[in-house]
Amino acid sequence: MQVTETLNEGLKREIKIVVPAKALEEKLNEWLDDTKDKIKLNGFRPGKVPAEYLRKMYGKSFMAEILNEIISDAPRSILADRNERPAMQPQIDIDEDEKILDGRADFVFSLKYEVLPKFEIKDFDHIEIIREIAAVPEKEIDEQVERVLSSTRSYSLKEGLSEEGDCVTIDYLGKLEGVPFEGGADSDAQLILGSKQFIPGFEEQLVDVKAGDTKTISVKFPDNYSAVHLAGRDAEFDITVKAISKPDELKIDDEAAKKVGLESLERLREVVRGQIESQYGSIIRQKIKRQILDALDADYNFEIPEGLLEIEFNNIWAQVNDDLKKAGRSFEDEGVTEKHAREEYRVLAQRRVRLGLVLSEIGMKADVKISEDELKAAVFDQVRQYPGQEKEIMNFFRNTPEAVANLRAPIFEEKVIDHLLSRIKITDKEVTVEELMKEYDESDLTEKKPEKKKGVEKTPIRKKAPKKG
């Protein structure tokens, strides 16, 4: 096998490989000799099939297997000999020639790939970060407890006109151009006015109605409504108001806490405090991580493989366009041209790829490992995100090894961040919740995404009971 480097520019490599016809012929003869005692053919005793007859019958198929074996093994051995790590699977280009299968021509193919850049990991002594600490205000706990217990609020029938906060019981029939549509009708549906449970414009037209009223309201489904056949359509709903109920005073006590499954109000407050502290902790973690990544980004400026850059950019760009589509917005609405947006997101892609390589190198040198238990926990976390589909999602991961492999990257990254936290200087700083949240919003931890229009995912009526909390 003759191996010749034909390109070495930056990270790009091209290698030409020539396997002489003589070497192929020798390999084929080995295969034929190895199989002559194993093949049974009518008219021949075992082991007595003439070599030329075997070659005529199986020569091309054997040679095809030999070539596949070479293509499978050669890239790995060549890269090992060259002490190179490819950024992606090498591209293999083959010179097709029918004579090769007959053993009458050299087998020529080439490898095209990019190597991972070589760089030295710098010391971390100079990296200093601020860890913000914010105490949970009692007022925030009070407000969250009230939201939780609002599901226990009772309602009492009232006379007179409805107002925001009241629960209205209605029958409704939706129509498109005068024709009822599927899923557009319900009876004894209950709606708390002001809950934004329905599409924009629906609830507002049920303020100032009384029991016994009938009316027809006109609404327009959002352009990005989840039911495609309704998206952007004008519709009318024939409404019959059957009852108006006013909210009773919300009781915040041990009995109310028991209704949501906790033994006391004090225990409920403990749970709520823990949830809020966990939310703060996630924000603090992201801000710490951002500071570390910013510091690493400033430390390294090596060339990155174009193939990895294109993959990362295409993933980001697809997500950006998907977000814009879901939000019913365009680049012009965001005050930026598509060309400028592409440039900005390409810079982000470069940062992500470079930092990914740096974190990977740090993790390798620190011998960061991912245990099977950690991987299983990550799979179960994914499964829990799809209630009602747990079995299907679990089967997906069982049958898709690459999906499980994709879960390794974020786990590995977080473990590398933990390793760095043990090596850098951290200064705690007490801040208010407002300061914590304000800086979190402004820090742009990921690329900015278009804001979604409020209420675009609401459906007309879903429940027969008042929506609580």
From Swiss-Prot:
This is Trigger factor. The gene is tig. Residues 439-460 have a biased composition (Basic and acidic residues). Its EC number is 5.2.1.8. Involved in protein export. Acts as a chaperone by maintaining the newly synthesized protein in an open conformation. Functions as a peptidyl-prolyl cis-trans isomerase. It catalyses: [protein]-peptidylproline (omega=180) = [protein]-peptidylproline (omega=0). NCBIfam families: tig. It comes from Bartonella quintana (strain Toulouse) (Rochalimaea quintana). Belongs to the FKBP-type PPIase family. Tig subfamily. One of its GO terms (cellular component) is cytoplasm. It holds the Pfam family Trigger_C. PANTHER family: TRIGGER FACTOR CHAPERONE AND PEPTIDYL-PROLYL CIS/TRANS ISOMERASE, TRIGGER FACTOR-LIKE PROTEIN TIG, CHLOROPLASTIC. SUPFAM superfamilies: FKBP-like, Triger factor/SurA peptide-binding domain-like, Trigger factor ribosome-binding domain. The keyword Ligase does not apply.
